[in-house]
Amino acid sequence: MSDKTFLVEIGTEELPPKALRSLAESFAANVTAELDNAGLTHGKIEWFAAPRRLALKVANLAASQADREVEKRGPAISQAFDAEGKPSKAAEGWARGCGITVDQAERLTTDKGEWLLYRAHVKGESAEALLPNMIATSLAKLPIPKLMRWGASDVHFVRPVHTVTLLLGDTVIPATILGIQSDRVIRGHRFMGEPEFTIDNADQYPQILLERGKVIADYELRKAKIKADAEEAARKIGGNADLSESLLEEVTSLVEWPVVLTAKFEEKFLAVPAEALVYTMKGDQKYFPVYANDGKLLPNFIFVANIESKDPIQIISGNEKVVRPRLADAEFFFNTDRKKRLEDHLPRLQTVLFQQQLGTLRDKTDRIAELSGWIAREIGADVNHATRAGLLSKCDLMTNMVFEFTDTQGVMGMHYARHDGEAEDVAVALNEQYQPRFAGDDLPSNPVACAVAIADKMDTLAGIFGIGQHPKGDKDPFALRRAALGVLRIIVEKNLSLDLQTLTEEAVRLYGDKLTNAKVVDEVIDFMLGRFRAWYQDEGYTVDTIQAVLARRPTRPADFDARMKAVSHFRTLEAASALAAANKRVSNILAKSDETLNERVNAATLKEPEEIALALQVVVLRDKLEPFFAEGRYQEALVELAELREVIDAFFEKVMVNVEDKDLRINRLSMLEKLRELFLRVADISLLQ
């Protein structure tokens, strides 16, 4: 039998749009693994996903597994039979497992002895017999957080299932999947094309669905069409569509036959901050906003219909009517909120709990204000502006706009602060206090904003760790991992002179007696250093490079970064491998010694030329490198230390360290300790592999 194309399509009710891609990709990965594990050879595997279907098409699928020879060695002959030649229980159990009797077994003779042997020719199973279970298993492994049950059956899936199509070439594979008997029936678009039709051959998919069912099953093709049509629609009205990836993905997952249309809203709504209008259009309505070439929002939006209407004007008008009340709400909230100053909301923060043991949002803003001022002083920012921004940082949470449109927190604080006449860096800080919100997000743009962003995150870290509620496993309800990484990114990428030790101590101090964890400072610092590990691994640094720096526990993030770059560069040097090995040897020698070493190397005790040369080099470099260490010039320091390779190699080749002469032994150990201390000023080089 020749290879054939295999098709599986699961026809469902509307699938969750934000999960559609991951469901389809996981389905493809699961089926691929099942085929490979079963030894069924195949060609390209394509996945298809639309709101009411998941499908896979496998090219050149083998008709069956290859036949194979099976050999199973049993017990040694000496243990397979007793003195009378009767099979032992071990032999009988082995034979039973192979489906034979002991006397049917062959014997395997080698130079090491003789064993019972089972040998068989196993015929490969057909793909038709294997596929139903493979598909069922693959569907059961999909990442579905919440399953549904429908009708009177006990079947569970992400959404109710109506059709299951299993075709191998032109043959239907009989099976019951998710409670549905397989067939060659496929359902088309709800309102266009044929509602239901049969497919004769797997190779006809997805073209037959496009032509007869009016469904673009190819997810990437559908997405590309929406993107291209939306860009063209925006160009026609002299603008650029805001086609954010997340919304583009969601809209792609909502439609089977995308028709891009352009609509408008009243220009008076442009007086409302663009962020609020965009939040309404994108978040609530799944519309694409349109911007002019100068970056200003236009009174237009682009949306995607799931039907090709004979009267698109009606659809456009309907969407304009839907969005208008939402924009009118935003306008009302904006005008109402501006009747009060931001600071007028401070008393209401006392009514909102931050955390049961840690007090209210007003308590938190007071701490943020003081900590922001302290940080500003450390980094040379405007202390008064930072303190003011910290005090106002959560006031916009009490406004009507943010209550209704929660994602506008921060940005509305900025607009209201500008309206109140606050300093510009204060206003900007209110918006940027939450940055970076995710990996790769922008950092705060000015020093005051940096101070407030760090203060907000450090207050949360200190408080939650201070009551013993640090993240456990995958659970991180207060987003402490994101907060820690955000603080580190700001300090490193803005090159701020902040020390995690004093920063954490100050954040903890501001809580007074609210915290119950006596180890809170150390735990917060260790947690943040752990975030460094994840960050630098993502940046491509090797694990041992990170461990070498972490071993020194540097608490200044900018200093940590400088050490990482220095060690990474050191690894490119020709002497790096030998020096890492030498450091490891020195470390092991010192670890095995329990003797009290000298504070200084006694020059008079030195005997061998090689130890004299090494001692001299250590003294010279110690003095020479002190300014390097003080200024954080770690890369230059390690380059200088790399020059020690030859004298270190010569020392270990010619000099015995653990000699019987105690004074000589201790002097040599002391010299090695001084040598190791030089490298440890940067990192623990002995940990490099």
UniProtKB/Swiss-Prot annotation:
It is an enzyme of class 6 (ligase). Its EC number is 6.1.1.14. It holds the Pfam family tRNA_synt_2f. Keywords: Aminoacyl-tRNA synthetase, ATP-binding, Cytoplasm, Ligase, Nucleotide-binding, Protein biosynthesis. GO terms for cellular component: cytosol. Its main location: cytoplasm. PROSITE patterns: AA_TRNA_LIGASE_II_GLYAB. One of its GO terms (molecular function) is glycine-tRNA ligase activity. Belongs to the class-II aminoacyl-tRNA synthetase family. Tetramer of two alpha and two beta subunits. This is Glycine--tRNA ligase beta subunit.
